[in-house]
């Protein structure tokens, strides 16, 4: 093996298979771009992002780990969210939950 070498299987890799998902329309009503990372609790994103926030509780973006979605000022786009896994406890972010979902 060479350092940094990757061994990739043939075929497609399905992310988050079998998890609950929801698609929301999100609008950036602010005057600055807002970027949201793959594992950020979407319910707690910047208040300038307008969407059906209650539907995002316990959800994150359904994108590859380590990537992000950027919302430009005035932009509206649809995003797919996926349910968080694990113990379903949320700490940090904006401090809106701080415990079990």
Swiss-Prot record:
Q: List GO terms (cellular component aspect).
A: urease complex
Q: Name one GO molecular function term.
A: urease activity
Q: What is its EC number?
A: 3.5.1.5
Name of the top EC class for this enzyme: hydrolase
A Gene Ontology biological process in which this protein takes part is: urea catabolic process
Q: Which InterPro entries match?
A: Urease_beta-like (IPR002019), Urease_betasu_sf (IPR036461), Urease_subunit (IPR050069)
User: What are the record keywords, sorted?
Assistant: Cytoplasm, Hydrolase
**Which pathway?**
Nitrogen metabolism; urea degradation; CO(2) and NH(3) from urea (urease route): step 1/1
- Report the locations given in the UniProt record: Cytoplasm
Q: Which SUPFAM superfamilies match?
A: Urease, beta-subunit
Reaction catalysis annotation: urea + 2 H2O + H(+) = hydrogencarbonate + 2 NH4(+)
Q: Does the keyword Lipid metabolism apply?
A: no
Quaternary data: Heterotrimer of UreA (gamma), UreB (beta) and UreC (alpha) subunits. Three heterotrimers associate to form the active enzyme.
Similarity annotation: Belongs to the urease beta subunit family.
Alphabetical list of PANTHER family matching this protein: UREASE
- Report what the protein is called: Urease subunit beta
Q: Which species expresses this protein natively?
A: Bradyrhizobium diazoefficiens (strain JCM 10833 / BCRC 13528 / IAM 13628 / NBRC 14792 / USDA 110)
Q: Tell me what gene encodes this.
A: ureB
């Amino acid at each position: 093996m060479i350092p940094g070498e990757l061994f990739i299987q043939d075929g497609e890799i399905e992310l988050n298979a079998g998890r609950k998902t929801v698609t929301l329309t999100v609008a950036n009503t602010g005057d600055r771009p807002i970027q949201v990372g793959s594992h950020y609790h979407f319910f707690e994103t910047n208040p300038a992002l307008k969407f059906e926030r209650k539907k995002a509780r316990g959800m994150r973006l359904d994108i590859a780990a380590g990537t992000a979605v950027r919302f430009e000022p005035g932009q509206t786009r649809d995003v797919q969210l996926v349910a968080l896994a694990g113990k379903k406890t949320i700490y940090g972010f904006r401090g809106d939950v701080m415990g079990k979902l």
